[in-house]
Each structure stands twice: as C-alpha cells, then as structure tokens.
C-alpha cells in the first residue's frame, strides 16, 4: 500500500525534526532553584516557565493548587522519582498551553498558536477516587469557559508537541486532551487507576504518533474523537496522518473499546466540517474488544430529534496485528445482551463511516456465537438502543458505506476461514420506529480477502 509507506516516512521525518528542534534548547533551571510557598509549588513552577526554556524537576513530591500555563518553546523534564500532584479538591486542570481557544461554536481561524512544548518523565497525580463528571474536575478555569474540557492536561493550537515517559494516576477526567495539533508525539505513557479516557484527541490534528500506551482507565485508553459530544470537545474537525501502535489496556479496565468517532458537524454560523479520518494506522493493540468507527450524537428524545449531524468520512485506514476476544458486548444494553434480531449485532469493528479503503490485516478474533449469535468480525450500518424513558442512544436513520474492504490473514476462533462473508454484517433498518426517521443501512461495495 503506497499510503502506508508514505505515512511511515512522514511520521519518521516528523519525529526526527521534533528531536532536532527540542535538542537546541540550552537555557535550563532546576525547579528547586525557586522557592515554594507553604508547600505549594504552583507559583514557583509558573515563574520558572516564564523565565526559562527548560525546567528540570528533581526527584521529590510537588503539590500544585492551580493551573500551570505553558508558553511556546518550553521543555519540562521530570527526573525519576518526581511526583507532581494536584492539591485535594482543585477543580481546574493541572497544565495547559497558553493559546487555547473554544473551537466548538465557530471554526478556529487565524488564532495565535504555540510552538514547541515538550514534557518528559514524572508521575502526575490527581486527587480523585472515581470519575468526577464534567464540570467537577479538570476544568479549563473556574468559570468553565471552555465547556468541553475535563482533563489533567490540555494542549490545543500547538505545533510540535512531545509527551513521553509519563505516568498519570487517579485522574477524575481525561488524563490528556488534544485538539488543533500538528506534529505531535505521545509515547511511553502509563495510566494507573485513571477513571476516564487516557489520551482524548479531538479534531484538526495532523501528523501524530501515539505509541506504547498502557494501563488502567475507566473509558477509552486512546480516543480519536474528531466528532464528539459538546461536553467532551475542545473543537471539531478532521484528523490525518496517524500512527497509533503498541497499546495495552489492563484487564482491570472495565470499558474495552477504542473510539474513532467521525461525523459531519454544524457550527453556530451554519458552516459545516467533515470530521474525517484519513491516512491512519492502528496496530499492535491488546485488550480492546471493539473498535468503534462511527458517528454518535448524544442521547436525545424523539420529540426533540437528534443533534444536527451526518456520517463522516475516511480513507486509507489500516488495523493490523490486533487480538480481540469478543466475549460480551462492549455496551451491556438489552438489545446486545439478548441478541435482538435487528438491533443486536456486535462486532470487533463496528463501522458507521463512509470509507474509501479500509484494511484489516493480521486480525485474530474470538467470537462467542453460542452466547451472542449476532457476533461478527465487522459490521456496518446504523445502531439503535432505546432507554426506558424513551431516550435514543444512537442514530437509526444514518446510512454508511465502505467502498473497499481489504482483509488479509484473518483468524476466527483460531482458524482462517475460506469464506469470510459469514463474519461480515451489513445492517439494515426499515422504518424501525414511527416517531423518528429510522431507515438506515450499511453497505460494503467490495471485499478483497486473502
């Protein structure tokens, strides 16, 4: 595949250029050269960042009682044994770059960007014992002026970002949230007793490497949510040129999915953006049972109708070297638990995006059709679940299409099937409900299997 070789070369060169750029930083200072106040290091760390390009945090424990604002051209190196924690009850995030902006109401145009932020090492600790919920931890500021932020660290409108060799612990919101990023490396990150997404990536991202991510989280280990709910988004837009590899989700993590959410988003001024994914490789992934590649609006009631949204697009997307044990539905809802004949399909790859070329290579999946007969390697098409209060979870009116599905070295329950079609499902809804549009379908035009 030409796109695969070109993408590998592009990301390799990006990583090298980033290393050369950050290696040129020579002005450094120890954080302990500054004085803390009553055991709080917020002011000292902020002052050090304002005055020097490289801050070294020695081994020890450091408490912050507010947010650190990182300007352009900065490196933070936390030595082994450095533990940086938020003080008990602090509701704002720990760190963000200086040029963040709300990109959910209007497209981001000509906004000043940061260039060059690098953080390496350290254990970064929140005070939470469970997921706190939006507006209760990880806020952008005390006024929650950026509504869709709930994270330990936020990086947006940044060119050249490197986060590596970091441990996150007890995060009540996302550990890392990104959007409007170009030329980023996120690698060697571990999560310990975190309660939401590990790495949460929103839109307008170009040239990103995510690798060697592991640990325990309460939601997605890594999420590429170019289209997402308002309370989880810093912006909306496409993502291109992605390598995401070597992910290991701990067995103790209860939600074993990886969301890759596309969609058509409408801004307040009526302009629209395709939150698309193009040129992406996801490989060497363990512990995930379902990859979700579709548009999902928030829960709505038929009388009100769903948010304005449409099916997003993608092209040249590869999943490779992945092991899946689909021992139960990822969403423990009645339709899936009871294998509803129309709405009960589950799959390792659940598709609801208009995709040009999708590649599945070296996939080893175990299906448990004795318990869940509507289990598949991949499915495409609409989804629908109704709560008891009448709320609709998905979008049964959306149709989607894959032009070319390329399958290579697929193993189902340990065997390589001669015929793959029994493991691929095109979902069709035909006037499923009377109260909302509910005639959607999924279609795969061509399947190439070897």
Predicted segments with their positions:
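Extracellular/periplasmic carbohydrate-active domains that bind, remodel
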Residues: 1-450
């Amino acid at each position: 595949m030409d796109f695969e070789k070109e993408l590998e070369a592009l990301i390799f060169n990006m990583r090298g250029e980033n290393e050369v750029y950050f290696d040129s930083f020579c002005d450094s200072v120890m954080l302990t050269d500054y004085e803390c106040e009553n055991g709080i290091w917020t002011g000292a760390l902020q002052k050090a960042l304002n005055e020097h390009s490289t801050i070294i945090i020695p081994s020890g424990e450091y408490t912050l009682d507010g947010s650190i604002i990182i300007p352009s051209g900065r490196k933070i190196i936390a030595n082994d044994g450095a533990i940086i924690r938020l003080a008990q009850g602090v509701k704002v995030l720990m760190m963000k770059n200086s040029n963040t902006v709300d990109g959910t109401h209007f497209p981001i145009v000509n906004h000043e960007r940061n260039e060059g932020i690098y953080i390496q090492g350290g254990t970064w600790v929140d005070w939470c014992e469970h997921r706190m919920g939006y507006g209760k931890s990880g806020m952008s500021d005390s006024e929650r002026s950026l509504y869709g932020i709930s994270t330990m660290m936020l990086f947006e409108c940044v060119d050249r970002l490197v986060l590596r060799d970091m441990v996150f612990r007890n995060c009540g919101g996302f550990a890392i949230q990104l959007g409007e990023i170009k030329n980023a490396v996120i690698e060697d990150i571990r999560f310990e007793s975190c309660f939401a997404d590990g790495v949460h990536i929103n839109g307008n991202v170009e040239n990103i490497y995510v690798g060697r991510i592991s640990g325990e989280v309460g939601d997605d280990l890594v999420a590429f949510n170019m289209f997402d709910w308002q309370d989880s988004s810093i912006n909306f837009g496409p993502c291109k040129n992605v390598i995401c590899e070597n992910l290991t989700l701990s067995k103790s993590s209860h939600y074993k999915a990886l969301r890759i959410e596309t969609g058509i988003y409408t801004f307040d001024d009526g302009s629209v953006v395709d939150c698309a994914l193009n040129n992406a490789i996801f490989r060497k992934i363990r512990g995930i049972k379902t990859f979700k590649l579709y548009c999902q609006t928030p829960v709505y009631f038929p009388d009100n109708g769903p948010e304005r949204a449409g099916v997003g697009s993608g092209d040249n997307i590869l999943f490779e070297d992945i092991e899946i044990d689909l021992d139960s539905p990822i969403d423990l809802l009645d339709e899936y638990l009871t294998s509803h004949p129309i709405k009960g399909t589950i799959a390792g790859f659940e598709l609801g995006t208009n995709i040009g070329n999708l590649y599945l290579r070296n996939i080893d999946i175990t299906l448990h059709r004795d318990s869940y007969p509507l289990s598949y390697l991949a499915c495409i098409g609409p989804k629908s679940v109704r709560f008891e209060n009448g709320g609709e979870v998905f979008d049964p009116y959306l149709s989607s299409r894959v032009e070319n599905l390329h399958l290579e070295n697929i193993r189902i329950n340990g065997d390589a099937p001669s015929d793959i079609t029994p493991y691929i499902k095109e979902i069709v809804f035909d006037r499923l409900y009377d109260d909302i549009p509910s005639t959607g379908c999924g279609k795969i035009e061509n399947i190439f299997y070897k």
